[in-house]
Amino acid sequence: MAASISGYTFSAVCFHSANSNADHEGFLLGEVRQEETFSISDSQISNTEFLQVIEIHNHQPCSQLFSFYDYASKVNEESLDRILKDRRKKVIGWYRFRRNTQQQMSYREQVIHKQLTRILGVPDLVFLLFSFISTANNSTHALEYVLFRPNRRYNQRISLAIPNLGNTSQQEYKVSSVPNTSQSYAKVIKEHGTDFFDKDGVMKDIRAIYQVYNALQEKVQAVCADVEKSERVVESCQAEVNKLRRQITQKKNEKEQERRLQQALLSRQMPSESLEPAFSPRMSYSGFSAEGRSTLAETEPSDPPPPYSDFHPNNQESTLSHSRMERSVFMPRPQAVGSSSYASTSGGLKFTGSGADLLPSQSAAGDSGEESDDSDYENLIDPAESPHSEYSHSKNSRPSTHPDEDPRNTQTSQI
């Protein structure tokens, strides 16, 4: 038994094997023919030899491993029919590609081969094994192949011949023509076959060959034009898709920026709201309105008086000039030990409020303290003085020390 495979089928399988990242498998399509060789020697002795030749014309690759059998090596006929379809009768074998393995059939492959032989009904089913071997430094790559015909006892190796790859002698070429499966080619031959072939299939005229050639070229050019148009359409569609993708990405970026800006504004507003005081600013410790009513009752007894630096004479002058003395606020003058703790009035106004208008600390004083405080208060403030003289006197006279530094000038509540 001998076997041969067409050049383009062998090159296609080798190309697929070299460029694949994993193992793959498929089916071999072709036919099996018988050759009879009759030889006569010089001694008038004739010898007849019959040779069975397996011709592989095409192949049908599978999409992945385990496509027509399961992990238990059981062949599924439905999957097999779905892969082969109408080519089931042309199957003469199957092939498999493995990397860096020995060129021997595995037990799984032997089990699958027996099932395929029974299901397909081909007794001479063959198995073609491809293996790709490379050296350690990847300097040499070798693609090895071997054809098996499994028997009951052992796996018989069959020599595989590839036409047009050896010597260019006539013996290396195939005797029978390879069937062409192209529909366009069959259509052209059907139209122009009667012009240069007789009924017996003998060529009539060589001129008809050129006509067929021109017709084929026209078909090819038409197909090329259609392919070019379709490629242009695909390019334009791809450009539109890329443009839409860029627009979508840009809109997403804009929305993300807006969201970040809103978050930044919210984060800025939250600290500002947290820093705002929860209560209104307090008024000055003591003072009088334009009508002369005291606001001592409105202040809390525990609030300390503001520093004297806030009521510096220069500051008072600027305040009086701008506000036209509509709202004048003065702090009590520093007083000696034992003096009254009543606040002095500005603009010639005297304190005429009742005891309810005093601070709780001031109203807690005894009767004797009140009498001495009234005398001291009259000595310090002269009713005959005009508001302007008092203002000038307060401007020229300046306390030497801060009330916080001199314990003699501090205000004490009488208990």
Swiss-Prot record:
- Phosphoserine-modified residues are 274, 280, 368, 372, 375
**Residue numbers spanned by region Important for interaction with SHMT2:** 215-222
Q: What happens when the gene is disrupted?
A: Mice are viable and fertile, and are protected against toxic shock caused by bacterial lipopolysaccharide (LPS). IFNAR1 'Lys-63'-linked ubiquitination and IFNAR1 internalization are increased.
Cellular component GO terms, alphabetical? BRISC complex; cytoplasm; microtubule; nucleus; spindle pole
Q: In which tissues is it expressed?
A: Detected in heart (at protein level).
Compositionally biased intervals (Acidic residues): 368-379
Q: Which family does it belong to?
A: Belongs to the FAM175 family. Abro1 subfamily.
**Protein function:** Component of the BRISC complex, a multiprotein complex that specifically cleaves 'Lys-63'-linked polyubiquitin, leaving the last ubiquitin chain attached to its substrates. May act as a central scaffold protein that assembles the various components of the BRISC complex and retains them in the cytoplasm. Plays a role in regulating the onset of apoptosis via its role in modulating 'Lys-63'-linked ubiquitination of target proteins. Required for normal mitotic spindle assembly and microtubule attachment to kinetochores via its role in deubiquitinating NUMA1.
| Protein name as it appears in the record | BRISC complex subunit Abraxas 2
Organism expressing this protein natively: Mus musculus (Mouse)
The uppermost taxa in this organism's lineage are: Eukaryota, Metazoa, Chordata, Craniata, Vertebrata
